[in-house]
A protein has these predicted regions:
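N-terminal alpha-helical interaction modules that lie
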Residues: 8-81
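Conserved alpha-helical positions within TPR/SEL1-like repeat arrays
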Residues: 71-74, 102-117, 144-158, 184-199, ...
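Eukaryotic all-alpha helical interaction scaffolds
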Residues: 93, 135-136, 176-177, 217, ...
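Structural signature of alpha-solenoid helical repeat scaffolds
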Residues: 99, 140, 181, 221, ...
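TPR/TPR-like (Sel1-like) alpha-helical repeat modules
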Residues: 244-261
Length: 285
């Protein structure tokens, strides 16, 4: 994809506001935007309205943004900022590049992911389904459509439609095993299927998939994701009433995550909730 400069222009932007907004964008938006081919730049703007805009093929594309949303006071507000940005990005990409383009499909997928972080699973599902339709049209069944099958499965899982979710998750796994072999994406599929089966109280089956996820991540050396798989395995053992094994796995996962120092990541926050639920302890203990 061509690299394009994307500008988020805000009037009367103070230094501390720039730093605050940069922090939220870095955590939820910037790296995904870079994957899409955009270089995000913040700058002051002479007009009254805040806008997100870029130039493509000698034409300017812009979307207005409510300035009040851009300076979050907490994590929830920060997510709303990033949701707003990705909503604007989907419109910009559709107008600039066309509906059935990878630009638009990617932006839809990222909007869906951000909505999932905000527990808006039904809205996220619609984004993933639309992105899947575009990517199947463009690429057929490949790694990109597998991403959407996986995300659709997770969204259905989140809204409690576990059997439907399982169908999509299995489809993603089938493609990833065929196209990628032992790969992080394949490990992710095994991990997500384990979660899905656990939600349906099929814990012995979930155990098989969780172990396969860990085996791949051990082989490729993805320590951070190994911790996430260990966390899931601990939850399964807890459901099987093997508290000792569950505690040992959680302790190991926590040690790995503490080594990264990512105390505010979504993964660590999730693990804190899990440990509090099972053992009544915080992640730091």
């Amino acid at each position: 994809m061509e690299h394009i400069k994307l500008t988020l222009a805000i009037p009367k932007m103070e230094k501390h506001e720039i730093e605050e907004l940069e922090s939220w964008i870095d955590s939820m938006c910037r790296y995904r935007l870079e994957d899409l081919g955009f270089d995000l730049v913040l700058r002051k703007y002479k007009h009254k309205e805040s806008v997100l805009f870029f130039r493509y093929d000698k034409v300017y594309y812009s979307e207005r943004i409510d300035r009040k949303m851009l300076f979050p006071s907490d994590r929830k507000a920060g997510l709303l900022v990033c949701i707003e940005i990705w909503m604007k990005m989907t419109e910009l990409c559709k107008r600039a590049f066309g509906y059935r383009t990878e630009w638009h499909a990617f932006a839809l997928n990222q909007l869906g992911m951000t909505l999932m972080y905000d527990n808006q699973s039904t809205r996220a599902l619609q984004c993933f389904l639309e992105s899947l339709d575009i990517r199947k049209y463009l690429w057929g069944e490949n790694e990109l459509t597998a991403v959407e099958y996986n995300n659709i499965g997770c969204a259905y899982d989140a809204i409690g439609e576990w059997m439907v979710g399982n169908t999509y998750l299995m489809k993603a796994l089938e493609i990833r095993k065929s196209k990628l072999g032992d790969h992080e994406d394949t490990a992710e599929s095994y991990c997500n299927i384990a979660n899905n089966l656990m939600n349906m109280q099929r814990n012995n089956e979930a155990l098989i998939y969780a172990r396969k996820s860990i085996a791949i991540r051990n082989r490729i050396g993805d320590n951070f994701k190994i911790a996430y798989s260990l966390n899931n395995l601990a939850l399964i053992y807890n459901n099987l009433d093997e508290k000792g094994r569950a505690k040992s796995l959680l302790d190991k996962a926590i040690r790995i995550l503490n080594g990264f120092g990512w105390t505010e990541s979504m993964e660590i926050l999730t693990m804190k909730v899990n440990r509090n639920h099972i053992y009544g302890q915080s992640l730091d203990t």
